[in-house]
Amino acid sequence: MGNAKSLSGQKMASRFLPEEQAEVDKLFDVLSSSEGGVATGTFSLEAMKSHVKEALPPAMVTRLYNGMQRVKPTDRTLGSCRSVSREQFTAFLSQLLRGSCEEKGLMVMNMISDAEGPTKTRDVQKFTEDLVASVAHVLTHRHELRGWTCRKSEVPPDSMQAMVAQLLSEMKFQDGYKFQGPQCLDQVCDQAMIEEWVFHVPHVGMFLSVVVHRGLCLLGSSFDPSTLVPECLADQGGRFESILDVLSVIYLSSHLAPEHRQRWRLLFSTQLHGQSFSQLCSHITSQGPSLLVLEDRDGYVFGGFASCSWEVKPQFQGDNRCFLFSIAPRMATHLHTGYNNHFMYLNYGQQTMPNGLGMGGQHHYFGLWVAADFGKGHSKAKPACTTYNSPQLSAQEDFLFDKMEVWGLGNLLEEYEGKNKKSVLDSNPEARSLLEISGRARHSEGLREVPRDED
């Protein structure tokens, strides 16, 4: 590991393509130039902050600078210099962006602690907080939220803390136990732990790449925002504000197949379509894979990924790619267990079967359930949902909600286009009759045309 610190800038530069190295050299020349435009051979923290301006929080600029400055140069006369040389600059960027897990771990370790002595978990936590905040900041600053506007001007602190906790939850200590919360903050972290963390948590390296590519405006062609943040297709004239923010979108997108990460199409929203189960059914059926998200009245945000189109029928549907998730107060995903195939359920207008939308578990005991009596649901898990091994997702086992969204993922395939253009009430007379008998209002009555049957 000691050798990694003294690898020459020339060797590190070989990890970049010639045109990339030229861009790295150009940025160094800008940073190291005096006010008169003369290159000095090194640059200071003040010069770096002046160049970055408002693109990154000052704390992250300082961490990047410290990481560069702590790379041991081959020229020992520069070892005590408090500025950054070309060799250190190139070596840091090369190892951080293109290095092995060991090399990336070393650069991250250099960025984490600025004090002598052992690095503790609280130092890693503070670094992770700065990293997550920097990603949210720079994507906002560079106007690369791709349509995911926040309900407030900034990403909510609760969302940032949930992302930080999720990243730290994958950190494993020498005794094999994972990070469990505040009681672990005084545990010592060695470089091997950081290397393993960087290896097992791809978001760490991904977020550092965003900070470098967008914060320093370096090697921008190497970073495609669509791989991180899907495009939000919800053109509602500025009226729509999603339950999700950019960090929760990044988290959920990372658990999807590549073809589902490019763009998300808003299919249904209570904000736009009202509290209507028939509206929900008519908007989400035959739309391909989708993501449904709810926020209960206690502020818990959770939902599920449906791997195929929803169909109104009294049988379970879907496959083992489906999963449940929570976003607030904590971020987590819950995959299939193999215990049963109760992945997805959508039914309406049946007198002998449950009417509503469900995922996981069994009839009347779903891991996630949205009742046809819209605005009510349950999440039952004692001790866990049999299908997804998920805990109770909502604050209360039986919950009330006002906010729900369903997103279609990727482009709508031809096999789904043209299907199910009718409302579920048009195609299911029994459902229509049952609704009228129960005295429930038909919110869409008079607001739409009933489509004609296709030949």
Swiss-Prot record:
> Which portions of the chain have biased composition (kind: Basic and acidic residues)?
442-455
Tell me the ranges covered by the TLDc domain, including all copies.
242-410
Give all cystine bridges in this chain. none
The positions making up the signal sequence are none
PROSITE patterns xrefs: TLDC
What subcellular compartments does it reside in?
Membrane; Cytoplasm; Lysosome
- Location of the region described as Disordered in the Swiss-Prot/TrEMBL record: 435-455
Q: Taxonomically, which superkingdom?
A: Eukaryota
Where is a lipid covalently linked (N-myristoyl glycine)?
2
A single cellular component GO annotation? membrane
- Report any Pfam family annotated for this entry: TLD
- What processes in GO biological process is this protein linked to? negative regulation of cellular response to oxidative stress; positive regulation of protein localization to lysosome; regulation of cell migration; regulation of cell population proliferation; response to amino acid; response to insulin; response to nutrient levels; TOR signaling
What keywords tag this UniProt record?
Cytoplasm, Lipoprotein, Lysosome, Membrane, Myristate
Explain the purpose of this protein.
Activates an alternative mTOR signaling through RPS6KB2 activation and EIF4EBP1 repression to regulate cell proliferation and migration. Recruits MTOR at the lysosome, essential for MTOR signaling at the lysosome.
Q: How does it assemble?
A: Interacts (via C-terminal domain) with MTOR and MLST8; the interaction with MTOR increases upon nutrient stimulation.
Q: What is this protein called?
A: MTOR-associated protein MEAK7
The organism named in the record is Mus musculus
What gene is this protein a product of? Meak7
